[in-house]
Swiss-Prot record:
<dbReference type="InterPro" id="IPR045031">
    <property type="entry name" value="DHP_synth-like"/>
</dbReference>
<comment type="pathway">
    <text>Cofactor biosynthesis; tetrahydrofolate biosynthesis; 7,8-dihydrofolate from 2-amino-4-hydroxy-6-hydroxymethyl-7,8-dihydropteridine diphosphate and 4-aminobenzoate: step 1/2.</text>
</comment>
<feature type="binding site">
    <location>
        <position position="203"/>
    </location>
    <ligand>
        <name>(7,8-dihydropterin-6-yl)methyl diphosphate</name>
    </ligand>
</feature>
<dbReference type="GO" id="GO:0046677">
    <property type="term" value="P:response to antibiotic"/>
</dbReference>
<feature type="binding site">
    <location>
        <position position="84"/>
    </location>
    <ligand>
        <name>(7,8-dihydropterin-6-yl)methyl diphosphate</name>
    </ligand>
</feature>
<feature type="binding site">
    <location>
        <begin position="239"/>
        <end position="241"/>
    </location>
    <ligand>
        <name>(7,8-dihydropterin-6-yl)methyl diphosphate</name>
    </ligand>
</feature>
<dbReference type="InterPro" id="IPR000489">
    <property type="entry name" value="Pterin-binding_dom"/>
</dbReference>
<feature type="binding site">
    <location>
        <position position="103"/>
    </location>
    <ligand>
        <name>(7,8-dihydropterin-6-yl)methyl diphosphate</name>
    </ligand>
</feature>
<feature type="binding site">
    <location>
        <position position="11"/>
    </location>
    <ligand>
        <name>Mg(2+)</name>
    </ligand>
</feature>
<dbReference type="GO" id="GO:0046656">
    <property type="term" value="P:folic acid biosynthetic process"/>
</dbReference>
<dbReference type="GO" id="GO:0005829">
    <property type="term" value="C:cytosol"/>
</dbReference>
<keyword id="KW-0479">Metal-binding</keyword>
<dbReference type="GO" id="GO:0046654">
    <property type="term" value="P:tetrahydrofolate biosynthetic process"/>
</dbReference>
<protein>
    <recommendedName>
        <fullName>Dihydropteroate synthase</fullName>
        <ecNumber>2.5.1.15</ecNumber>
    </recommendedName>
</protein>
<feature type="binding site">
    <location>
        <position position="167"/>
    </location>
    <ligand>
        <name>(7,8-dihydropterin-6-yl)methyl diphosphate</name>
    </ligand>
</feature>
<dbReference type="GO" id="GO:0004156">
    <property type="term" value="F:dihydropteroate synthase activity"/>
</dbReference>
<dbReference type="InterPro" id="IPR006390">
    <property type="entry name" value="DHP_synth_dom"/>
</dbReference>
Length: 267
């Protein structure tokens, strides 16, 4: 049975929108990682820079100071480690320690050394769709054009196709209607044959799905609904805060999809 990968979020920042300040020392971060592993995480995604609206950009040195001690403490654990960074200097420092994946919210567009660095260490990379929100074509077409162009550049740099993930970038440079359009057409991203990572957890999109104001934690059940929907559309991994809820849900949806496929094959 094909298993949907669960990427657990570990923000080692003081200002992330959902859990800023909760895990920004090594001891609390390690405790959280162990808990997420017990809950079913296949990947831990460590992030040292907040992506909330209006966040303050920090220096490379500050990002390294936040991320490296945590990575050093967890890199030997029996779980894949991803680092959420768009800076090749941070990526390389973490890859030297044995990190498996670089999760680049700018898909190599911010730092043109990123692909060479990831290829050098034979690692995986997540390419997320981003931008300034100004586009000359419909959002899905622009997303596909941009991500496929960057995936091509990643392959030229030496990263094999099976180590390139695509993320549609829910919550980044899109209107509410554009995010809804991207979700409805996830299967078109899946059809590229690159593995797709869906990252909606606790974002504005999930609040708007509920139709009323909520705290980030109160959006977990709706996040799980997007997980189920994404899996049915063919995504291979989901990036979430609430690992236990989404891992259980994904296991159930994976079973049902496998059962459906088996019945179709039998008939």
């Amino acid at each position: 049975m094909t298993k949907t990968k669960i990427m657990g979020i570990l923000n080692v920042t003081p200002d992330s929108f959902s859990d800023g300040g909760k895990f920004n020392n090594v001891e609390s971060a390690v405790t959280r990682v162990k808990a997420m592993m017990d809950e079913g995480a296949d990947i831990i995604d460590v992030g040292g820079v907040s992506t909330r609206p209006g966040h303050e950009m920090i220096t490379v040195e500050e990002e390294l100071n936040r991320v490296l001690p945590v990575v050093e403490a967890i890199v030997g654990f029996d779980v894949k480690i991803s680092v959420d960074t768009f800076r090749s200097e941070v990526a390389e420092a973490c890859l030297k320690l044995g990190v498996d994946i670089i999760n680049d919210q700018w898909a190599g567009l911010y730092d043109h050394r990123m692909f060479q660095v990831v290829a050098k260490y034979d690692a995986e990379i997540v390419l997320m769709h981003n931008g300034n929100g100004n586009r000359d074509e419909p959002v899905v077409e622009e997303m596909l054009t941009s991500l496929l162009a960057q995936a091509h550049q990643a392959k030229i740099a030496g990263i094999p196709s099976n180590k390139i993930w695509l993320d549609p970038g829910i919550g980044f440079a899109k209107t509410r209607n554009e995010e809804a359009e991207v979700m409805a057409r996830l299967d078109e991203l899946v059809a590229t044959e690159y593995p797709v990572l869906l990252a909606t957890s606790r974002k504005r999109f999930t609040k708007e799905m509920m139709g009323y104001d909520t705290t980030p934690v109160e959006r977990d059940e709706v996040t799980a609904a997007t997980t189920a929907y994404g899996i049915m559309k063919g995504v291979r991994a989901v990036r979430v805060h609430n690992v236990e809820l989404n891992a259980k849900l994904a296991k159930g949806i994976d079973f049902l999809k496998e059962n459906e496929n088996a019945r179709h094959n039998f008939s």
